Amino acid sequence: MDLYKELVNGSGYAVHPIENMQLFKKLRDSFVDKMNISTKSEKNIDVVRKVMAKMSKAEINRSMINLLTFTNLSDMMINSCPSLVETLCGKELFIQRRAHTIINVPGKEHSKQWPHYEMMSGISPFTYVLWAPLHDIEDDGGAYHIDQKASLEV
């Protein structure tokens, strides 16, 4: 598959495996640690997800502020998929020190599309969004793709 053609002329997205899963797991563990909402004995993403589902907006905001100290998140994400990033962007990159992070929590006031809004915001024709869940996806209820051609008709 020609990745660039698929993104620009095809469906508008591509599913790609994480190349360095060990580093990606370290990224996930660092994320959990920086959120600072689980106990020392239960520092895992599933505990964080359960706790966050019951948190108020103010509590979630405090946890998001804690993430501001995670200044190497972008680097870790890039190094988790180095050949993908190099294929799309080349070797010289301009990256954000603090990665853009959105937390999806249950409830009517939270849109399921919110975590994916940056894909359609028109940031730049030269911007690519790397999206990777920090938890296992057990079914297709939490992840879905909208074909680029179909989305243009909406």
Each language-model region and where it sits:
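Catalytic core of non-heme Fe(II) oxygenases with the double-stranded beta-helix
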Residues: 109-154
